[in-house]
């Protein structure tokens, strides 16, 4: 099996626990959350808290496809990610990569998949070790038809920071959240 992913306390990430996804460098903002974007109230985009003191919303990470008995989240394996929160959109909070280019980029959004691909892998993500890391630092990848690094970028209007397929990738750590 590939090695497990670890949280900021050095414990293995588990599919039955909640985590905050934080930037490895807190000077670069806070944790991941949901926000409306590009003039639309719904669906909600995966975005980053501007304030480095804010942890964002907790996520649940689970193996993609079926329910394997292994509850440990491992590097380089397909996972599904969803926020553990309620929204005014009354839609799923599971992440997927949007097929539509918004401001020239593919965003990670929540809610229903608008234009499913034949592979149906819009909600497949991977956690990879950050190459320069001595500690438990990682990068996220969207792995639909092919894997793409995920980074944060700013709305053209200078508003929120969104997560999507872009360079440079966003280096993250996982901090265990209290049970919901």
UniProtKB/Swiss-Prot annotation:
InterPro entries: Kunitz_inhibitor_STI-like_sf, Prot_inh_Kunz-lg. CDD domains: beta-trefoil_STI_ASI (cd23373). One of its GO terms (molecular function) is alpha-amylase inhibitor activity. Gene3D superfamilies: 2.80.10.50. It comes from the Eukaryota. The keyword ATP-binding does not apply. The record marks 66-67 as: Reactive bond. The keyword Transmembrane does not apply. PANTHER family: KUNITZ TRYPSIN INHIBITOR 2 (PTHR33107), KUNITZ TRYPSIN INHIBITOR 5 (PTHR33107:SF5). Inhibitor of endogenous alpha-amylase (wheat also produces an exogenous inhibitor which inactivates alpha-amylase from animal and insect origin). This inhibitor can also inhibit subtilisin. Belongs to the protease inhibitor I3 (leguminous Kunitz-type inhibitor) family. This is Endogenous alpha-amylase/subtilisin inhibitor.
């Amino acid at each position: 099996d590939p090695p497990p992913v670890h949280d900021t306390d050095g414990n293995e990430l588990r599919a039955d626990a909640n985590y905050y996804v934080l930037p490895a460098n807190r000077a670069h903002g806070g944790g991941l959350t949901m926000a409306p974007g590009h003039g639309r109230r719904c669906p909600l985009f995966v975005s980053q808290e501007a304030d480095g003191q804010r942890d964002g919303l907790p996520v649940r990470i689970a193996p993609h496809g079926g329910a394997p008995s292994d509850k440990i989240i491992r590097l380089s394996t397909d996972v599904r990610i969803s926020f553990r929160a309620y929204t005014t959109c009354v839609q799923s909070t599971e992440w997927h990569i949007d097929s539509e280019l918004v401001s020239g980029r593919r965003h990670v959004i929540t809610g229903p998949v608008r234009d499913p691909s034949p592979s149906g892998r819009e909600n497949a993500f991977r956690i990879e070790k950050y190459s320069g890391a001595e500690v438990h630092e990682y990068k996220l990848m969207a792995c639909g038809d092919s894997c793409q690094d995920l980074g944060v970028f700013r709305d053209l209007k200078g508003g929120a920071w969104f997560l999507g397929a872009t360079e440079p990738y966003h280096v993250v750590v996982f901090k265990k959240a209290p049970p919901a």
